[in-house]
Amino acid sequence: MGVSGSKGQKLFVSVLQRLLSERGLHVKESSAIEFYQFLIKVSPWFPEEGGLNLQDWKRVGREMKKYAAEHGTDSIPKQAYPIWLQLREILTEQSDLVLLSAEAKSVTEEELEEGLTGLLSASSQEKTYGTRGTAYAEIDTEVDKLSEHIYDEPYEEKEKADKNEEKDHVRKVKKIVQRKENSEHKRKEKDQKAFLATDWNNDDLSPEDWDDLEEQAAHYHDDDELILPVKRKVDKKKPLALRRKPLPPVGFAGAMAEAREKGDLTFTFPVVFMGESDDDDTPVWEPLPLKTLKELQSAVRTMGPSAPYTLQVVDMVASQWLTPSDWHQTARATLSPGDYVLWRTEYEEKSKETVQKTAGKRKGKVSLDMLLGTGQFLSPSSQIKLSKDVLKDVTTNAVLAWRAIPPPGVKKTVLAGLKQGNEESYETFISRLEEAVYRVMPRGEGSDILIKQLAWENANSLCQDLIRPMRKTGTMQDYIRACLDASPAVVQGMAYAAAMRGQKYSTFVKQTYGGGKGGQGSKGPVCFSCGKTGHIKRDCKEEKGSKRAPPGLCPRCKKGYHWKSECKSKFDKDGNPLPPLETNAENSKNL
């Protein structure tokens, strides 16, 4: 740039803010000063020897990268890389304004006047640059932009004299342009008057003069049609900023973007596909949010790895495309060492089952190394090339292995041994049953069938009798509604009733709730006379016709219609005590 010290810093900051503002980007002055000071530290040669050109700027980028490798990324300002990338893009476009601003301080008054004169002469000869008025307006615009680049930032008091001197220099340049414009305009008016004063009735001209005259006339009319009045704007408005690409991401996301450009895929997880298939687009890798990992670790620590909330967080993590290495890192970071060993064992077992199931069913064969991340798929860079189908199998096996981890302090039980207690509510039993089944197999039609079968077989006797009428046609919701009344209090009362009747608890339940229709069993009502089912006492035919009806009141007690031999009263109708019953022989004599 050829300028150092505070003056060079102000010039660089002014040019930097102007260039970025034209791209719709606003950089604070403090950030620009911080970047300039860092630039001097990294490239001390730049203020004196360098310039805003693509070659020098690429050299600055290489030195910044070398500085980061030696001192670490924390030593680099946060906005250093984004500013360097934006300026590199501007310099690649070879903007005339950038080149003019970069060399503004080295242009002398004579060189500027010669450049303006050359531009005026070129604009008057070529139509591609428009009219002379347009050319002058372009020159004024460039001079004004140059002035704004240099003087839009106020200097200190000690530099006011230099500022006024440079403003006078710009005024002189404008006066030179105005003087040349006036002289050119006067020359044109003179040619116009001479052209109008020509006697067109005089045909005494040679053919060469006629050709020259026609050429001049044609040239004159072309220029006359293109002449526009030169209007100098006093209050100039800044042009609207064009829409430009936003600044690249900063921080860890910016480092990830730069790493992807350079091919460094060490921390590329999880995998993000933007399309619906593998051919729609290339996969993009983003880091798993740290907040999600913290939430998962907190849930495991406070509620356990198999708690419903923890499993919900695991499902949220599983909604992304994670490789085997990502799942191992996540499980190792959140689970305890013992639970991690259990998870890894279950994951390997599920992966082997997946390989056996998918053998010969897919075009692309799924190997155990793909699912486990071993062998040729040991490195993360090789795992990111796995297809979506393989990543789905990896996620499914990882979630199933996580659900197989038993709660803290609970031993792994067999499903057949998971039975409902006598005083346990049916909905609590169903909750335990679902948790155990989902820990073994994923949610689906197979797990629903297994839960329904065990909900009937492993229920207690009371709930089985309530469910029996709807066992084949009802759903799990029907089972739960039927057993809502089977509370511990009801079970305790039925146990007391069975004990008072001298029956077993299961027999009493069958007689009371069998079939679930108001105490009628599956084979009909129970007869109180003979004890058989299928009829009641009044319809009992067991001893009908074998006994004769008593003729009247009992001769012994005088208060009942029964035979004397069947009398069991101890007092007669008057309250007198009765003697014991006579024997069969004495009774036969009385008859």
From Swiss-Prot:
Pfam families: Gag_p10 (PF02337), Gag_p24 (PF00607), Gag_p24_C (PF19317), zf-CCHC (PF00098), zf-CCHC_5 (PF14787). GO terms for molecular function: DNA binding; nucleotide binding; structural constituent of virion; zinc ion binding. A lipid is attached at residue 2 (N-myristoyl glycine). GO terms for cellular component: viral nucleocapsid. SUPFAM superfamilies: Retroviral matrix proteins (SSF47836), Retrovirus capsid dimerization domain-like (SSF47353), Retrovirus capsid protein, N-terminal core domain (SSF47943), Retrovirus zinc finger-like domains (SSF57756). This is Gag polyprotein. GO terms for biological process: viral budding via host ESCRT complex; viral translational frameshifting. A zinc finger (CCHC-type) spans 525-542, 552-569. The record marks 99-100, 195-196, 228-229, 254-255, 269-270, 496-497 as: Cleavage. InterPro entries: B_retro_matrix (IPR003322), B_retro_matrix_sf (IPR038124), Gag_p24_C (IPR045345), Primate_lentivir_Gag_pol-like (IPR050195), Retrov_capsid_C (IPR008916), Retrov_capsid_N (IPR008919), Retrovr_matrix (IPR010999), Znf_CCHC (IPR001878). The keyword Transmembrane helix does not apply. A motif (PTAP/PSAP motif) lies at residues 305-308. The keyword Repeat applies. Keywords: Capsid protein, DNA-binding, Host-virus interaction, Lipoprotein, Metal-binding, Myristate, Nucleotide-binding, Phosphoprotein, Repeat, Viral budding, Viral budding via the host ESCRT complexes, Viral matrix protein, Viral nucleoprotein, Viral release from host cell, Virion, Zinc, Zinc-finger. Residues 154-193, 568-591 are annotated as: Disordered. Residues 154-169, 178-193 have a biased composition (Basic and acidic residues).
